[in-house]
């Protein structure tokens, strides 16, 4: 209802400039009606006239749009009368006697506050008649009649009795004027009408007022609520008017109540109207009881008694000054008179019927609303009518009553309330309403208004006890609301709305004395709804009764408290009935403005009335209820819960959504029941702008300025305010018409109430149990649902405003410290499923100096559990035997499927049959089991589902389980129970008889060659045999069409239940894709339904029923196979899939594999992606379950069993899903299964020659990452402590061991990069740290000696240059200790290069063996260059040795062992040192860069010894000490000697001398060795190192010469070596151990040296391989060729250091020790063969080469000593740069030799010179064999191999530095 429309009679713009204008306009707008005038004059007459006119007027209104339009046209005068005195107003408005109405209006206007005018308070004078116009306009064109309110003084216009006087005046002829006035400029019209009304009220009020009072007492139950808004306005003009209208009306109401009972037809115009229209309308809208009650009451309201009743019941009168006395005086009588008036209602029953026709339907009422929406009055009416469906009448009656009651009723019971209630309760029978007349105080009316308030609530009478119910949605705290609620199904609040609506509606429609009040109530009442309606109706706007009181400022004020209580119901009521009124929110602004005025007026009066509303004050926001839809708890007003005025201000439609609904909602119904009253409310809302102003004007006396402010606020607040007390309701006033904005809920009455209730909002709060304390005006609780839930109706949600957000269960903020203190049970999950949890138990603990324990939370026990124990994996899924591969899994798969089927069948519907209706889920459950069974058959028969009798039978049993027992003769008919096939109805399917004429026609057509016509002629005559035969033979293209026709007409005609058979025929006829149309017709799939034209056809059935016959259809097709029938099966699957039957569809797809695509989700052609999962219809669930993946894997497995070429081995798109499954398994702790899936995926990816796009890198990476994580995760615990071996593990272990032994890798050195020989937690430790901790022996100390004199812990430090030695993670391994030390030695050498090594030091080789054996004293460990313990002032001994010692705890690591005698050599060693430096990087010690580079070279080969004991002391390497040995040592250096030689080197450096004899023979080769050493010249590095160390350079020269010789020897040896290598390989391949043995045979003689020079051993093995007989030499720890001569053994023992690139660098260093004590060393060399031969290391230099070399290196120099005397021997030995050599095998021999020679031979210098040579040679050999391996352990290993190759090369004898050495070359 467009309350604000400028054309509205109440609209400010439409207000008349003068009363004359109003009259003119009214006359123009509405033709005066004599009956109306009569009615106006006499209350009884008015009542009758009201009934009549109500009929007419309501008919118009009922018509809705027309009447509303008229109402709009009749600006204020028409609408105003109707609202003013519900019936009377209607009568003037409808009757059309504008003059009468206008006359009445002037009189009333005098009495009535001009504030009642529709115009805003500021715009309109208190005498404004717009109020009445609004009501009338709201109802219909009679708004001109509504002008009677304008002709009535403002006081009369108010909902208070003064409005009644105008009705009387109107009855006398003012009605016609009243019709005219507002048609003019709204402002002028209003002014004119006001003036006229005042004058008329003054003149006619006494008589008319009495009559009006009588009728109004009855009608005003409805009208008063409306009028209550008016009374507020009247309060401005009409204390007198109110008195006239109120007291006189009360008297007349009392008198006329009885009279009206007699005069229903006659009496007061308003009474008649009220009776007729209101009662008729209410009776129509409401139940018959409501109609009767309305009839009974409406006469009284017509007399204005209803107004009193409303005020009394609603306590609304408190809002109006005039109403207070009226309510007090007349409320009780009115309650009684209401029954008298009810007879009028009976008279008006005709109107009721009309109203029923017009408004009985919510939609019709909504229609009115739109019409009213059209005009200002119409808008109000439409808004009101919109809500009238459920709450309009209630609002009219209830609003009026609520105006009376909600004010008093919210918390109080008013006698008048009950009486008014019946009238007001649109949906409550008026009879019921009257039953509650107890409260006499009009302002404390029982909740009776509440009961009627809700239009949709039954019009159960609301007793005074029901005041709280006044609020249709949430009666405040009043008990009565419950009864009302009982009727309404909600709270009493709805009844309040009914009353207001009934009365308001009458006022609105019937032209109550203060129709403007109703509009104002509609608008203002919204505000009051915020206050009163909120009190009555939490939804506020819905409580019309609540609204009306506000218009009466005084009375309303006193009543608002109750009303405030009522407003909650009112608010609720809007939610329920006025949700349609929510639109009234739209006009609500007007109403609220109007009601704001009313509340303002009310506020002064509430002073007296507050007591009733004491509780209601909370509901001051009741105004919002007005705005709130009747059915939605005044959502708009929610924010305005605290103040009704704000909500009312907003146009009734202000809560836009509610406004539209208001018309359809309670307002509509209110109109239907109480046209005038409700119209009044509607008009008020429409007028919200001007009407509110009117109310302000009228209320000005009471509280004009405040109201005025509220008016402005109301539009905004009104919308919110409706939800004030019940903001939730305002919020709830959704767009639903039942949830109109609370303001629109009970527009008129609520608005009126809100005014008073604004003051009384707190009382409302108190009063309305449903609406807790109203939230602040700005507070908007969440919107309430628009449903009619009890909460919505009663305003239960209104309570929400108090606490919109429920308090958290815990008072502590989650982030508060206290909250954090609560115990928690953290849980963490590891990558592979363990879950770690711990609690925080409270434990008593004693603090210091405390005698009492304090209970504190301390870390609890940590519990580690497997996640599968906590969250077990579903057993059926966990037992899946996947990944499925090979026929071995077939049995397990079938067993798994069988178990799954059994478990699934347990959950099936108990009584399933094909004909039993089941839900979609039940059907899918059955089909799911079928899918599992089909898969089991698929696997059992190796991927075959058809083609052999066994499979066919198995499938048939699944698809047609009852087929076997059926009679074979009638399998489909008698067996129809199973198939749903043809039934007896099929008997009707008979082809037409063959007529001779038809056959003749066919014959002729065939003769003419027109076979197509012949075919169709036969088909048309149902000669299907002819047609099919001809088409098949002559026109194959027509055959399918003819077959379709035959199937359609003869097989699958409607009702035959032959869908499956028809589908089979379609398949057989070749219509594969179309055959499924027989199951589900195409029109059904398109969502259409066809209507059969056959009269005999059976009743239509669900077109989807055929879909349930898919199993039967599939069985028919499979049992009758035809060409390409797979396409039909596929089509059937597609059809099923389209209807969400995934399992059934996949069964079909499995049978049509050749026509179905089983592909990825990204492939649009894929029919299914995962078996049992719908990727189209249920994409959100797709792939989220594991079962479909498992079924898909089973399907894939079945395909693989089929073995057909067309069947892919794997379905690539499943790889990602399998990975997902693997992850799930891992998460649940099934590590091994997850690994198996990863392996299967990886295999599938690599097995395909052409990679599938699904096997992309991302998938590969994900699989690889998961595999790595799973492998690192702990294995699942086994039941036994004994590991369960597997063949793979056993075979892998055996072969790995064998291969390692053959290759020499498994010597246990662990120096290899992998350190395989040293399992354990330290196996991967880098930096050369020993894998296994050594005993704290001197050796270890020696290793560290450099840094820490004897302990050299730093040598062990991995952080040092260890990296160089580190190369062998296990460099520390017994054989490779030296190698790692190389790094250390490098570090040390640089520093300690100068530090003399004691002759006792061992060479690196010694160190290696030292690692093998428990090293001797650190001194011995130091043997050679690396006396780590030797505090030799290595520049940075720690750094030097650190790496190496780390790698090798063994002596080598202590490269810096101080070799006392070798000290001189150390200077030479520096030359060698450069090699070590390079190797370990210990150069930090001060080793020259050159050294560093060399050291690296050494480290690879002889990583064990790598660093000469001194930073640059490579010469100290024993290898170099003995010319040959150095060579050997060099090759062996880190890799060879380091790891492997150690064993041979076990003997200490002193032992090698025992091999001296071998060394001597080697002397022959010395030259050659020297020759071979020239190659080491390639060791430019060595030279560089020497350059770096000037001292070594002099030695280098001699070395160069020797190297040249050695190079030649090496070359020769290399050739032999190459041959031997191949032989070794062949031997290795041929007879396994022989290759081993071969390797060892050659080494036999040089066992010790060779072992050290593991690398040379390989070549040696090759040579030995050539020899056929081998034996294992325990001393050499090798297999030795029996046939091999001593030379061979020597060769083996003294393999040159070719591979040791590092040695070469060492040799460069040895250059410094080159003091050619070589000869001395040479002597020592033999011992290495013998002594060292035992030790593996000596083997590397078996011939004593190491010894001799070392000795040669420096018989007197530390280098030579280091080389030859590795430990104890002369200092020169220590100096020997043999470090690199030492690392190979040379070190041990050198050690040995060194000891013997170095010590004895003391040829420290010679050895040193030799060592350099050998080093250089070895480096050259390395070049030949390959670049020296990295300084890392791995490289060292390789170096060992290289050394072996060198050994293989044969034995080379030569002299280095005057020392003979033997070399295998």
Curated annotation (Swiss-Prot):
Primary location: endoplasmic reticulum
Keyword Transport: yes
Family matches, as InterPro entries: Sec16_CCD, Sec16_Sec23-bd
Compositionally biased tracts (Pro residues): 469-483, 724-733, 773-784
Family matches, as CDD domains: ACE1-Sec16-like
Biased composition, class Low complexity, residue ranges: 85-99, 213-225, 553-585, 613-632, 1362-1377, 1539-1557, 1701-1710, 1735-1760, 1811-1833
Pfam families referenced in this protein's UniProt entry, alphabetically: Sec16, TPR_Sec16
Subcellular location: Endoplasmic reticulum membrane
Membrane topology note: Peripheral membrane protein
Biased composition (Gly residues): 1309-1318, 1790-1803
GO biological process: autophagy; Golgi organization; intracellular transport; protein localization to endoplasmic reticulum exit site; protein transport; vesicle-mediated transport
Ranges of biased composition (kind: Basic and acidic residues): 344-359, 498-510, 683-697, 1594-1625
One GO cellular component, as annotated: endoplasmic reticulum exit site
Keyword Glycosyltransferase appears in the UniProt entry: no
Keywords carried by this UniProt record: Autophagy, Endoplasmic reticulum, ER-Golgi transport, Membrane, Protein transport, Transport
Main function: Involved in the initiation of assembly of the COPII coat required for the formation of transport vesicles from the endoplasmic reticulum (ER) and the selection of cargo molecules. Also involved in autophagy.
Family: Belongs to the SEC16 family.
Full protein name: COPII coat assembly protein SEC16
């Amino acid at each position: 209802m467009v309350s604000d429309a400028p054309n509205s009679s109440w609209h400010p713009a439409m207000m008349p400039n003068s009363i004359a204008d109003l009259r003119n306009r009214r006359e123009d707008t509405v033709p005066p009606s004599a009956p109306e005038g009569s009615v106006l004059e006499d209350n009884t007459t008015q009542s009758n006239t009201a009934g009549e006119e109500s009929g007419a007027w309501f008919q118009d209104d009922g018509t809705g749009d027309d009447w509303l339009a008229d109402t709009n046209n009749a600006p204020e005068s028409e609408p105003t009368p109707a609202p003013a005195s519900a019936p009377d107003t209607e009568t003037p408005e409808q009757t059309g006697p504008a003059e009468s109405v206008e006359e009445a209006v002037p009189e009333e206007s005098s009495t009535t506050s001009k504030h009642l005018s529709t115009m805003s308070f500021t715009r309109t004078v208190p005498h404004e008649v717009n109020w009445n116009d609004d009501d009338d306009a709201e109802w219909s064109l009679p708004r001109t009649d509504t002008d009677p309110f304008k002709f009535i003084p403002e006081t009369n216009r108010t909902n208070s009795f003064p409005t009644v006087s105008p009705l009387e005046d109107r009855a006398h002829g003012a009605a016609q004027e009243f019709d005219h006035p507002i048609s003019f400029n709204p402002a002028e019209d209003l002014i004119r009408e006001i003036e006229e009304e005042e004058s008329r009220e003054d003149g006619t009020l006494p008589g008319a007022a009495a009559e009006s009072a009588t009728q109004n007492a009855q009608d005003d139950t409805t009208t008063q609520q409306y009028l209550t808004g008016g009374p507020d306005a009247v309060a401005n003009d009409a204390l007198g008017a109110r008195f006239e209208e109120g007291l006189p009306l009360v008297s007349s109401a009392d008198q006329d109540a009885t009279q009206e009972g007699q005069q229903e037809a006659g009496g007061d115009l308003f009474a008649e109207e009220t009776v007729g229209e209101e009662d008729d309308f209410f009776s129509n809208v409401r139940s018959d009881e409501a109609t009767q009650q309305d009839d009974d009451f409406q006469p009284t309201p017509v007399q204005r008694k209803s107004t009193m009743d409303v005020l009394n019941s609603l306590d609304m009168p408190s809002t109006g000054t005039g109403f207070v006395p009226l309510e007090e005086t007349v409320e009780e009588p009115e309650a009684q008179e209401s029954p008298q008036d009810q007879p009028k209602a009976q008279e008006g029953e005709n109107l009721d019927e009309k109203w029923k026709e017009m408004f009985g339907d919510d939609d019709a009422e909504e229609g009115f609303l739109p019409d009213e929406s059209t005009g200002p009055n119409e808008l109000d009416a439409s808004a009101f009518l919109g809500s009238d469906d459920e709450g309009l009448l209630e609002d009219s009656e209830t609003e009026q009553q609520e105006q009376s009651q909600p004010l008093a009723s919210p918390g109080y019971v008013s006698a008048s309330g009950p009486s008014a209630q019946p009238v007001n309760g649109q949906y409550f029978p008026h009879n019921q309403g009257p039953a509650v007349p107890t409260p006499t105080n009009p302002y404390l009316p029982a909740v009776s208004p509440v009961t009627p308030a809700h239009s949709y609530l039954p019009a159960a009478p609301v007793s005074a006890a029901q005041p709280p119910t006044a609020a249709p949605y949430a009666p405040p705290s009043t008990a009565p609301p419950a009864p009302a609620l009982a009727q309404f199904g909600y709270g009493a609040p709805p009844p309040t709305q009914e009353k207001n609506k009934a009365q308001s509606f009458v006022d609105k429609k019937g032209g109550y004395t203060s129709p403007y009040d109703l509009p104002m109530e509609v608008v203002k009442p919204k505000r009051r709804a915020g206050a009163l309606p909120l009190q009555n109706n939490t939804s506020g706007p819905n409580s019309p009764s609540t609204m009306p009181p506000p218009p009466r400022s005084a009375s309303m004020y006193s009543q608002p408290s109750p009303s405030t209580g009522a407003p909650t119901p009112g608010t609720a009521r809007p939610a329920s009935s006025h949700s349609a009124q929510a639109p009234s929110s739209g006009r609500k602004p007007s109403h609220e403005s109007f009601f704001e005025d009313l509340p303002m007026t009310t506020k002064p009066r509430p002073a007296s009335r507050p007591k009733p509303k004491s509780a209601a004050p909370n509901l001051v926001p009741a105004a919002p209820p007005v705005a709130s839809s009747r059915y939605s708890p005044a959502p708009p007003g929610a924010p305005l819960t605290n103040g009704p005025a704000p909500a009312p201000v907003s146009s009734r439609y202000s809560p836009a959504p509610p406004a539209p609904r208001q018309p359809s909602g309670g307002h509509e119904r209110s109109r239907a029941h109480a046209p005038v009253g409700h119209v009044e409310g509607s008009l008020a809302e429409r007028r919200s702008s001007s009407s509110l102003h009117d109310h302000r004007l009228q209320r000005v006396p009471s509280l004009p300025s405040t109201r005025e402010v509220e008016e402005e606020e109301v539009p905004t607040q009104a919308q919110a305010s409706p939800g004030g007390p019940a903001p939730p309701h305002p919020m709830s006033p959704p767009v639903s018409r039942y949830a109109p904005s609370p303001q629109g809920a009970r527009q008129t009455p609520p608005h009126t109430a809100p005014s008073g209730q604004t003051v009384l909002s707190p009382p409302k709060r108190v009063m309305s149990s449903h609406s807790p304390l109203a939230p602040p005006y700005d507070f908007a609780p969440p919107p309430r649902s628009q449903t009619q839930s009890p909460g919505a109706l009663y305003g239960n949600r209104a309570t929400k405003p108090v606490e919109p957000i429920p308090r958290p269960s815990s008072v502590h903020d989650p982030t508060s410290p206290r909250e954090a203190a609560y115990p928690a049970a953290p849980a963490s999950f590891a990558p592979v499923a363990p879950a770690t949890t711990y609690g925080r138990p409270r434990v008593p603990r004693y603090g210091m100096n405390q005698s009492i324990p304090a209970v504190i939370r301390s870390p609890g026990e940590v519990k580690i559990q497997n996640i599968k124990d906590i969250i077990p994996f579903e057993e059926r899924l966990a037992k899946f035997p996947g990944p499925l591969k090979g026929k071995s899994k077939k049995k397990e798969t079938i067993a798994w499927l069988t178990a799954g089927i059994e478990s699934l069948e347990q959950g099936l519907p108990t009584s399933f049959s094909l004909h039993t209706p089941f839900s979609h889920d039940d059907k899918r459950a059955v089909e799911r089991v079928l899918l599992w069974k089909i898969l089991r058959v698929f696997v059992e028969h190796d991927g075959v589902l058809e083609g052999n009798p066994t499979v066919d039978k198995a499938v048939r049993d699944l698809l047609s389980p009852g087929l076997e027992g059926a009679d074979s003769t009638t399998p489909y008919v008698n067996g129809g129970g199973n198939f749903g096939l043809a039934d007896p109805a099929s008997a009707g399917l008979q082809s037409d008889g063959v007529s001779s004429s038809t056959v003749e026609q066919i014959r002729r057509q065939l003769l003419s060659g027109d076979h197509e016509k012949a075919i169709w002629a036969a088909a048309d005559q149902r000669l299907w045999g002819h047609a099919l035969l001809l088409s098949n033979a002559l026109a194959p293209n027509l055959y399918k069409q003819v077959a379709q026709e035959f199937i359609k007409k003869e097989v699958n005609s409607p009702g035959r239940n032959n869908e499956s058979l028809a589908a089979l025929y379609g398949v057989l006829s070749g219509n594969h894709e179309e055959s499924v149309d027989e199951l589900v017709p195409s029109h059904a799939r398109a969502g259409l339904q066809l209507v059969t034209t056959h009269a005999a056809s059976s009743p239509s059935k669900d077109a989807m029923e055929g879909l349930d016959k898919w199993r039967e259809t599939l069985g028919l097709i499979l049992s009758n196979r035809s060409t390409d029938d797979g396409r039909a099966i596929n089509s059937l699957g597609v059809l099923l899939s389209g209807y969400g039957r995934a399992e059934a569809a996949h069964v079909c797809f499995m049978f049509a594999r050749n026509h179905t695509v089983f592909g990825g989700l990204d492939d649009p052609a894929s029919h299914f992606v995962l078996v049992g999962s719908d990727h189209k219809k249920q994409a959100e669930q797709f792939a989220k379950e594991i079962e479909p993946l498992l079924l898909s894997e089973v399907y894939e497995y079945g395909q693989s069993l089929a073995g057909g070429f067309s069947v892919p081995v794997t379905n690539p798109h499943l790889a990602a899903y399998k990975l997902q499954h693997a992850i799930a398994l891992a998460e649940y702790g099934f590590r091994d299964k997850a690994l198996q899936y990863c392996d299967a995926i990886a295999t599938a990816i690599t097995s395909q020659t052409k990679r599938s796009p699904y096997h992309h890198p991302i998938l590969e990476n994900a699989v690889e990452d998961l595999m790595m994580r799973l492998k690192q995760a702990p294995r699942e615990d086994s039941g036994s402590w004994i590991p369960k071996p597997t063949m793979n593990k056993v075979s892998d272990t055996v072969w790995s061991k064998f291969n390692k032994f053959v290759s020499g890798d498994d010597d246990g050195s662990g120096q290899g990069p992998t350190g395989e020989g040293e399992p354990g937690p330290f196996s991967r430790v880098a930096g050369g740290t020993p894998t296994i901790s050594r005993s704290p022996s001197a050796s270890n100390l020696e290793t560290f000696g450099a840094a820490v004199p004897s302990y050299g812990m730093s040598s062990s430090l991995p952080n040092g240059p260890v990296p160089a030695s580190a190369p062998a993670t296990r460099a520390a391994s017994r054989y490779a200790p030296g190698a790692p030390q190389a790094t250390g030695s490098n570090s040390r050498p640089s520093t300690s290069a100068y530090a003399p090594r004691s002759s006792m030091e061992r060479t690196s080789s010694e160190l290696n063996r030292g690692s093998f054996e428990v090293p001797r004293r650190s001194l011995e460990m130091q043997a050679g260059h690396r006396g780590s313990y030797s505090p030799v002032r290595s520049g940075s001994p720690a750094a030097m040795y650190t790496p190496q010692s780390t790698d090798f705890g063994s002596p080598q690591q202590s490269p810096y062992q101080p070799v006392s005698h070798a000290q001189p050599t150390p200077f030479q060693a520096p030359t060698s040192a450069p090699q070590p430096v390079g190797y370990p990087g210990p150069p930090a010690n001060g080793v020259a860069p050159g050294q560093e580079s060399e050291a690296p070279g050494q480290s690879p080969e002889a990583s064990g010894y790598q660093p000469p004991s001194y930073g640059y002391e490579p010469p100290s390497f024993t290898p170099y000490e003995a010319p040959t040995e150095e060579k050997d040592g060099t090759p062996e250096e880190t890799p060879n000697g380091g790891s492997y030689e150690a064993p041979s080197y076990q003997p200490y450096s002193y032992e090698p001398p025992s091999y001296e004899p071998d060394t001597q023979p080697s002397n022959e080769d010395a030259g050659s060795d020297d020759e071979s050493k020239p190659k080491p010249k390639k060791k430019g590095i060595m030279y560089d190192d020497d350059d770096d160390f000037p001292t070594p350079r002099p030695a280098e020269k001699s070395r160069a010469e020797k190297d040249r010789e050695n190079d030649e020897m090496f070359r020769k040896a290399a050739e032999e070596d190459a041959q031997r290598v191949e032989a070794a390989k062949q031997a290795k391949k041929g007879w396994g151990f022989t290759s081993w043995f071969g390797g060892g045979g050659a080494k036999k003689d040089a066992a010790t040296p060779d072992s050290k020079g593991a690398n040379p051993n390989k070549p040696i093995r090759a040579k030995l391989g050539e020899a056929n007989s081998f034996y294992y030499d325990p001393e050499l720890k090798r297999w030795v060729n029996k046939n091999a001569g001593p030379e061979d053994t020597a060769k083996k023992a003294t393999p040159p250091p070719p591979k040791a690139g590092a040695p070469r660098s060492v040799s460069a260093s040895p250059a410094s020790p080159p003091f050619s004590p070589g000869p001395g060393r040479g002597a020592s060399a033999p011992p290495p063969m013998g002594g060292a031969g035992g030790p593996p290391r000596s083997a590397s230099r078996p011939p004593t080469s190491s010894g001799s070399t070392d000795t040669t290196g420096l018989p007197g120099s530390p280098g030579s000593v280091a080389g030859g005397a590795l430990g104890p021997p002369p200092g020169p030995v220590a100096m020997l740069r043999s470090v690199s050599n030492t690392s190979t095998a040379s070190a041990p021999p050198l050690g040995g030799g060194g000891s013997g020679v170095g010590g004895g031979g003391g040829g420290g210098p010679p050895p040193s010179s030799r060592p350099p040579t050998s080093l250089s040679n070895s480096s050259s050999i390395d070049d030949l064999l390959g670049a020296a391996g990295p300084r890392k352990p791995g490289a060292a290993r390789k170096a060992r191999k290289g050394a072996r190759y060198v050994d293989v090369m044969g034995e080379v004898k030569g002299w280095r530095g005057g020392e003979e050495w033997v070399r295998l070359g």
